[in-house]
Amino acid sequence: MSIRQLRTLIAVRDQGSFSAAAEACFITHAAVSQQMKVLERDWDIQLFDRRRRSPQLTPLGKAMAAKAEAVVRAYDAIVPSVRDAGALQGDIQLGAVPTTLTGLVPLAVSRLKLRFDAVRVVIQPGLSTQLLQQIDRGNLDAAVITEPAKLPRQMKSRFIADEPLHLLAPQQTESDDPFLLLRRHPFIRFDRDAVVGQMIQAWLLDHNIRVNDSMELEGLEAISSMVAAGLGVSIVPARCVREMNPMPVKQLSLGPDGPVRRLSLVWREDNPRPRMVDAVGTALETAVSIGAFCPPDPKG
């Protein structure tokens, strides 16, 4: 048994087939099959039901994959846990929802690098649910997400900022009433696969507002550009860190009961580098306190 074989077993479970696991692990289908046969021989158990065209994990195989994941996570933590006892250095894999990538995250990372120049931050964009899965699998150290109503049991979170949702409208619109504008103008919808998109849909339903959907987008920049071009109105988060060159659009409050999205830094409770995660959280809080994207002066 080797760590490489355990990683392959985990990949088969996560990817659903030998072929997909081979692609994810950058090896051949035959190599995956051979590694799994070696594990079955060494452990003297049947990991897969091979009566189907694509072998499926048996219940025992699924249990062994879960145990293998814990072993691989502990193995991967050996060096980072030792490094974390000294000066902060090395890579941190940080996930971030796309709405934070043009203000909050770049400002926070630049602040972090001023304090710890031996740290390299590797950013992975994604939706909140995707990033939580990547943290759980050990592919990310932490992520900036829209915190859901309930976090998985093994996760911890650190509050970063509350961002009220507001209406974006073209500057030439005839009214500043968000309810009127939502009913009269085409609606540029925030991606419904995102937690924010689901919050927006729930708020529209609660207020019995029927909108005329014209398009559905994920990025704040793309949505703002469409609104600025006069193609409709949209509901998006009010950024806790303003971008350098905001689009010329109206930003209208949805009122005191408008939805608010909570940005949090989330990580696994057993993360082997707690000091690194804490440093990232502090950098994010510093960026929020600054409130606008402005690259820091290297001289301090």
For each feature predicted by the language model, list its residue ranges.
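Secondary-structure junction motif
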Residues: 183-207, 273-281, 287-297
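Central regulatory/effector-binding core of bacterial HTH transcription factors
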Residues: 89-151
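Beta-alpha-beta core module
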Residues: 152-158, 162-163, 221-270
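Short helix-boundary/capping micro-motifs
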Residues: 10-28
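Flexible hinge/capping segments at coil-to-helix
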Residues: 154-192
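A short LG(V/I)-centered, amphipathic sequence patch enriched
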Residues: 40-57
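A late-sequence structural motif
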Residues: 104, 251-294
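Alpha-helical linker/hinge and terminal dimerization helices associated
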Residues: 42-43, 64-86
